[in-house]
């Protein structure tokens, strides 16, 4: 049974928010009227504004547009474990957008409305002291955590985990006879057994005093959970248990011990209390624009039907589902959104089109222009608390024009070698020129039209190395190229391909099968060519092109071959060494934990 929240707390929260200065929503005049009388809420973790720890250009563009046009928004997430000011700093850097703590509503942000209600509280979750520090910044006067308890009461309180001096170095002394008035779980517990023991003891205590037992088992402190998500996805191929699992453990064990239900309150999406708090912040921002009436419509943009869309629909907000995260498809059959778009920019454009004339909207946002589907990511898990998770590997769209050009260059390598060996020199030269052309344009197209992909960062150098290896062997066999130089070129490429293959195998999510290893739609390791390596590739292609096309050239090219042999030999050695000494040449892109 949920506690009834004292709505005076919301008033106190509004007063507290009022003490801080809200950022102006525009870099122009602060009195400029918004383009539409609406508000937005965005899921701020992977899938809407960022992906795999990197900012999406659609996300940056959207937030800057809303700020410029004085349209209030809030970043509403089930993540937590840190203060909103820390989260704002991190996301500001990731998105290159100026954000403040007032732009965020994390799963535990509504706890700040309860700071005046409780004098002495216990906080749970997280690895370090950040949860306690967050609670103190919210205004809680006396805050203890589980390590304070174990330091005070010793090993007998929880004998199944050993704690050393390093673990409890930040422990805070407290009066064990002082009643604990509330227990707050801010983020997924790291010490689940200890935290479960604490909740059980306090739930059965008399007035929240440790070491006491209530005869009625209903005199304990108020208990709060900030996030009821049962599971969540990370880089591991199967979902991990979340804070919701801890809440279920607490409820089940308490029921078994006492025969009664554990009284507790749950926050986070899709629960109404979190949306109440988020709406309170949006209304405060709305009033700073001098608009006293409520906004005509509030839109929620998310990638998770289970939490984002379900919560928005239940609360009466207009839901927009995007395909840049967990969800991929036409719409969710279980929790259908009012609108589905490829990305957040297109979703916001649709929302504003309901309130802004087309001509005015086109002037503000430009003509309708979609982003390529390669910006989409399929995540590892579709979450549902009521059904088994649908397991999918993290994948991306690899069938883009740059990748197809690169793949054609890869296939042309053995064909060029065959034609050259059997003296079809003109045909070999033509195909070589085609391969060189694709090498020039594929990268340009990827950058110009936002068609880049992780698979492309692997396929492009692989195609170059395959082409050069095939031709180098042919030229060495026909004694057109010195054997020493051919050995240098091939040896460097063999070592480089071996290193990439090894790192891909190590970072490939389970199961590590032969088929999945060669499935480049599953991104794992990104190879970033060094500058000297790019120069070396260009010089090698120049040398190979000269040697391949020499039989059909209208002039004698012998004068250029010897200098190129020496130059290419030196750059080959230097580029090989650069991969060994350069930082961030190989990057594991598979790890993108959702908080």
UniProtKB/Swiss-Prot annotation:
For this entry, list what GO says about its biological process.
Answer: cardiolipin biosynthetic process; mitochondrial membrane organization; phospholipid biosynthetic process; phospholipid homeostasis
Q: Known Gene3D superfamilies for this protein?
A: 1.20.120.1760, HAD superfamily/HAD-like (3.40.50.1000)
Q: Which cellular compartments is it found in? A: Mitochondrion
Cofactor(s) demanded = Mg(2+)
Q: What is its EC number?
A: 3.-.-.-, 2.7.8.41
> Where are its TM segments located?
538-560, 564-586
One Pfam match, given by its short name, reads Hydrolase_like
Q: Which GO terms describe its cellular component?
A: membrane; mitochondrial inner membrane; mitochondrion
Organelle targeting sequence: 1-24
Is the keyword Transmembrane helix assigned to this protein?
A: yes
Keywords in alphabetical order:
Hydrolase, Lipid biosynthesis, Lipid metabolism, Membrane, Mitochondrion, Mitochondrion inner membrane, Phospholipid biosynthesis, Phospholipid metabolism, Transferase, Transit peptide, Transmembrane, Transmembrane helix
Main localisation: mitochondrion
Q: Does the keyword rRNA-binding apply?
A: no
- Tell me the protein family, please: In the N-terminal section; belongs to the HAD-like hydrolase superfamily.
Q: What is this protein called?
A: Cardiolipin synthase (CMP-forming) / mitochondrial hydrolase fusion protein
Source organism = Schizosaccharomyces pombe (strain 972 / ATCC 24843)
The protein's gene is named: crd1
């Amino acid at each position: 049974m949920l506690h009834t929240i004292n709505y005076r707390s919301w008033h106190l929260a509004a007063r507290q928010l009022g003490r801080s200065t809200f950022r102006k929503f525009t870099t122009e005049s602060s009195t400029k009227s918004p383009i539409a009388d609406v508000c937005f809420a965005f899921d701020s973790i992977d899938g809407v504004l960022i992906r795999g720890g990197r900012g999406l250009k659609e996300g940056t563009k959207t937030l800057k547009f809303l700020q410029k046009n004085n349209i209030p928004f809030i970043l509403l997430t089930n993540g937590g474990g840190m203060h909103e000011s820390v989260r704002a700093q991190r996301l500001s850097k990731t998105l290159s957008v100026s954000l403040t703590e007032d732009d965020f509503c994390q799963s535990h942000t509504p706890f700040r409305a309860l700071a005046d209600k409780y004098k002495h509280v216990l906080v749970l979750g997280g690895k370090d002291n950040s949860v306690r520090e967050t609670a103190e910044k919210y205004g809680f006067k006396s805050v203890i955590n589980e390590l304070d308890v174990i330091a005070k009461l010793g090993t007998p309180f929880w004998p199944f985990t050993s704690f050393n001096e390093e673990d409890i170095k930040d422990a805070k002394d407290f009066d064990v006879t002082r009643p604990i008035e509330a227990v707050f779980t801010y983020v997924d517990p790291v010490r689940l057994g200890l935290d479960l023991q604490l909740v059980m003891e306090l739930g059965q205590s008399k007035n929240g005093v440790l070491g006491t037992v209530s005869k009625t088992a209903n005199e304990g402190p108020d208990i709060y959970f900030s996030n009821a998500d049962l599971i969540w996805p990370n880089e591991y191929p199967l979902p991990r248990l979340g804070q919701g699992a801890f809440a279920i453990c607490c409820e089940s064990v308490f029921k078994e011990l006492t025969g009664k239900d554990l009284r507790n309150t749950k926050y986070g999406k899709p629960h109404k209390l979190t949306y109440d708090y988020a709406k309170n912040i949006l209304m405060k921002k709305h009033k700073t624009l001098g608009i006293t009436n409520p906004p005509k419509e509030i839109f929620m943009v998310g990638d998770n039907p289970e939490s984002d869309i379900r919560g928005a629909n239940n609360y009466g907000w207009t839901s927009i589902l995007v395909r840049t995260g967990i969800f991929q498809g036409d719409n969710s059959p279980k929790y259908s959104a009012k609108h589905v778009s490829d990305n957040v920019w297109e979703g916001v454009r649709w929302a504003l089109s309901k309130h802004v004339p087309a001509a005015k909207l086109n002037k503000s946002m430009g003509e309708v222009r979609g982003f390529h589907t390669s910006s989409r990511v399929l995540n590892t898990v579709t979450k549902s608390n009521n059904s088994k998770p649908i397991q999918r590997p993290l994948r991306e769209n690899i069938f883009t024009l740059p990748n197809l050009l690169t793949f054609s260059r890869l296939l042309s390598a053995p064909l060029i070698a065959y034609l050259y060996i059997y003296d079809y020199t003109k045909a070999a030269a033509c195909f070589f020129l085609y391969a060189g052309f694709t090498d020039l344009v594929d990268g340009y197209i990827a950058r110009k039209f936002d068609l880049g992909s992780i698979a492309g960062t692997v396929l492009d150098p692989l195609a170059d190395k395959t082409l050069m290896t095939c031709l180098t062997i042919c030229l060495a066999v026909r004694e057109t190229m010195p054997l020493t130089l051919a050995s240098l070129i091939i040896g460097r490429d063999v070592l480089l391909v071996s290193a990439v293959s090894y790192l891909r195998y190590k970072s490939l999510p389970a199961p590590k099968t032969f088929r999945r290893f060669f499935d480049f739609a599953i991104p794992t390791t990104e190879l970033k060519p060094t500058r000297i390596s790019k120069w070396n590739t260009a010089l090698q292609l120049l040398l190979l092109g000269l040697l391949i096309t020499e039989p059909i050239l209208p002039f004698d090219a012998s004068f250029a071959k010897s200098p190129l042999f020496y130059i290419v030999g030196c750059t080959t050695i230097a580029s090989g060494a650069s991969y060994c000494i350069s930082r961030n040449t190989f990057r594991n892109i598979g790890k993108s934990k959702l908080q």
